[in-house]
């Protein structure tokens, strides 16, 4: 008999609805314009990640949350710090009278409930309703059946499952730390101070003789918005002579290059679009704006893209790519959009970007250093996510084993051995 068999042998449970044992409430909307990029407390709303940060909180640490509305509705999380709960998320807090009635330890019972809800996450996400913004109803949450076990069994289940979640969290933290380390060195290498220093060392010049000068991107490159032939369905083609039609879905996660497209448009359609050449840059001008990509193919872009071209005599492609991904530039885009009435990254804003004008040989030196950092990071990102995925699957396996009970017999159902 396995340890799980032994732990759950003849375990009797009592079933309660989540709404009977927990306070389930939505948060309060906070004006997005008043949020900060860095602040004391995260704002948890309908998404998976914080919407921003503020210096106020309305929920204490160690609280379960469930996203109520939006694409991530039904996502279950556990916040270990104080936070602000927005209007598009629920908090799930055990009732004190239940804790007292069953003699539960609050910490273990709270984590037990988290694991129960995490097991129900897919069902919650599948229950989303609404033609506009999909949402999970409070009634759906209230109706989730929760097995109330003995204190001893509950504690052992939580300790077992938390070992897996803690390990996954540690791996994710390590991956994040490696990424931040790379970003730190990238931004340092691209700073004006470092470019001055490396140019002085490279050419044996005094700083005053070789000082980095800045111009705007619009002065040394062509920046344009894409264009869409309409209706686009009229111009989609399977013809081998068709022009690749570049869409956001054609680009892989964390990709640097656009290598292929799922669709092509006719030559006639391309005349009403913007045709780019291999080596040109594109950036999304709305939603997740400002992320650069290098074309590894010729293609046409719609009006959700901006293009950067005709810069190769002055700028090295890899140097430009790293510069555009830097925190300094990404922060520049945010500042321009937040301080104006526009809600997207238009061509005028892109043209206004200050950019260092340095010798191309020096650009290539910086780019090669960053290539090495990027390669090391890619190796790390290749290994750690695999380990995270493996541990996550182990957690889900044991969670199903430990939390699957038979409602009719009020005893644990366990038919598999490990």
Question: Would you name each region that the model predicts?
Answer:
Residues 1-418:
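Charged, alpha-helix-forming regions
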